[in-house]
Amino acid sequence: MKTENQSAPPDILPVCRSKEEAKQYYDRISKVYDFLAGAFERKYAEIALQRLSIERGEIVIEIGFGTGHCLKQMAESVGEEGKIYGVDISSGMLEVARSRLKKAGLLERVELYCGDAAVLPYDDSMFDAAFMSFTLELFDTPEIPAVLEEVKRVLKPGGRVGITAMSRENGDSRMLRIYEWAHKKWPVFTDCRPIYLERSLVDAGYGIRNREKLKLSGLPVEIVIALKKTGV
């Protein structure tokens, strides 16, 4: 049962499909996802990865890894001394990502898990960095704080998180209104919806290191690098 979040901004649309529906949808499109949406999203994911500045030997988690393009880049960045962990709700996406990593000879550096990011199967303070690209906005509004808390739990003190998301901040463009109309009409197909990314991270107790505002086909996008405060 969904709970009401009294502090949630009223202009954030709800997610009107279940997680099981999301899983089935992404399983179905996993082999063609790169053709359908991957090329549009990849540019912004790569910018966020550059800002996150993953270093050799680090332990990093990606939530919502999709077809594995970013996992591959991160595995190359951490080298043999590091380790990448990936979580995705779709077993179909996991198989596509696994195939990509195997083909690149990087599978030994990556551990993949099919499950819900709201409950991560990892120890406290395990990761140097975390990454999400067009994933946080797939969670319903009351669940976003819980996901960010769970990410914070598994980050080391001073660890960083890089997130790319569709943005509702200062957003009232015609393209945004059309997209939100499509989200209401086809909630499974158009399941991303704009959120307040920086505000959500601040509310969850993160420190903001960097924020950029960009456009994706006229739709506002935020890239934020945030830090888990020491002593938390």
PLM regions with names:
Residues 1-31:
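N-terminal, positively charged/glycine-rich alpha-helical extensions of SAM-dependent methyltransferases
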Residues 145-157:
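A short glycine-rich, Lys/Arg-flanked "PGG" loop and its adjoining helix->strand segment in the class I
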